[in-house]
């Protein structure tokens, strides 16, 4: 009998999904039935379409373990065969190395893509009715929020308040958790400043170096592709491996193809948001680094979104939504791999997370607009400009507060000279 691998048997275990297992105690997902359509399978598709049942299943993009409970007048296995066949007939394929992936442009996905094109393809000013002078404040706050949330997904346990104060005041990180958050903040700033540059293996390694700085057991692994296969994604409840990344020898070719995918248009048009989701997933799938793959994947997602002209991405904290729905985030990865690398599960999840992030941004802006209006009252004082008014408002709200020059620099992203 083959001995089960336990957590202690793995020299290095990636935190990309491991922390999600520790926190949520997920069990292994159920494997779907083998795809084996018959003549009856084809005959079943038409009535399912006419009833609108199939469209609903597609828009939610149900996995086998969810779909089987929807069967009414047919056996669950037969329903799965029909749904799977319909997906196969409408799929688009992608190839990375020896691995083939697919995705389906469901009605929901197409509607979401159109909505994002309408709302996040411009600027904060044009889309949200915010004065140009205020956009900088929202960007700084959003970078901080994204940095904190992306680190917390991977297990950073510092509170949001403490982490925000650390970044704004420019104090040195005092723990690994704080270092992770500071690293993410520096990475986000780097991406915003270099968003138009191409992705290369070297630039991906540099992103990882920024993300992993002083957080790995082996410092030499910062910014270095792994050269070993001691990387596993493990289900904590039973210590079973749920994902084994490609062999380390495959990494150069896979990353090279991923960079080409990032930098150039494919022969068949792929919507930029779909490409961003694929890039996010593929970094997690390849696991090119010993650790920090999740943070790197989310950073590359943001980079591609900004490169593609979706400027409002700078103001969205998608990782905060992912942190709140990390069980679904993990399952989106697992469903994709378990169901013949069907990326539609992950794309659907990611677009829904973006929708929630956009709604959260609108709520945040409405609240901040009221604060900005209150701060603007101080501008009636002779010689007080917008930035000064904000500082006065902070002190007015908290008379005990002491603002250092460093905190003003970080809060407003300005030089030391201007802060003084």
Set out the residue ranges of the language-model regions.
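FIC/Doc superfamily catalytic core
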Residues: 2-291, 295-420
């Amino acid at each position: 009998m083959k001995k089960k691998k336990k957590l202690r048997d793995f020299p290095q275990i990636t935190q990309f999904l491991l922390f999600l297992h520790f926190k949520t105690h997920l069990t292994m997902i159920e494997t779907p039935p083998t795809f084996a359509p018959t003549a009856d399978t084809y005959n079943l598709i038409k009535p399912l379409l006419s009833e609108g049942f199939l469209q609903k299943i597609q828009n939610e993009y149900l996995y086998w373990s969810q779909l089987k409970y929807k069967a009414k007048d047919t056996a669950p296995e037969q329903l799965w065969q029909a749904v799977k066949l319909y997906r196969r007939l409408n799929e688009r394929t992608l190839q990375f190395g020896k691995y083939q992936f697919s995705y389906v442009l469901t009605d929901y996905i197409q509607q979401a893509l159109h909505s994002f094109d309408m709302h996040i393809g411009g600027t904060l000013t044009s889309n949200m009715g915010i004065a140009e002078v205020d956009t900088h404040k929202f960007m700084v706050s959003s970078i901080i929020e994204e940095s904190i949330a992306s680190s917390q997904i991977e297990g950073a346990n510092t509170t949001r308040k403490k982490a925000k104060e650390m970044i704004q005041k420019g104090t040195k990180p005092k723990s690994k958790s704080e270092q992770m958050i500071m690293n993410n903040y520096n990475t986000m700033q780097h991406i915003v400043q270099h968003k138009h540059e191409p992705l290369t293996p070297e630039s991906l390694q540099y992103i990882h170096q920024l993300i992993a700085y002083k957080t790995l057991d082996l410092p030499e692994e910062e910014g270095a592709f792994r050269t070993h296969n001691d990387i596993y994604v493990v289900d904590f409840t039973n210590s079973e491996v749920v994902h084994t990344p490609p062999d380390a020898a495959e990494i150069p070719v896979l990353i090279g193809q991923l960079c080409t995918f990032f930098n150039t248009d494919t022969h068949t048009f792929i919507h930029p948001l779909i490409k961003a989701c694929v890039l996010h997933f593929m970094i997690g799938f390849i696991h090119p680094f010993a650790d920090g793959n999740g943070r790197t994947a989310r950073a590359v997602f943001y980079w591609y979104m900004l490169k593609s002209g979706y400027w409002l991405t700078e103001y969205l904290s998608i990782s905060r939504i992912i942190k709140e729905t990390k069980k679904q985030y993990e399952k989106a990865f697992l469903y994709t791999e378990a169901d013949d690398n069907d990326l539609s599960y992950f794309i659907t999840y990611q677009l829904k997370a973006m929708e929630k992030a956009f709604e959260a941004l609108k709520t945040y802006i409405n609240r901040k607009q009221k604060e900005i209006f209150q701060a603007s009252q101080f501008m009636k004082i002779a010689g007080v400009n917008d930035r000064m008014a904000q500082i006065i408002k902070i002190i007015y709200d908290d008379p005990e507060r002491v603002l250092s020059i460093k905190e003003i620099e970080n809060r407003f992203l300005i030089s030391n000279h201007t802060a003084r």
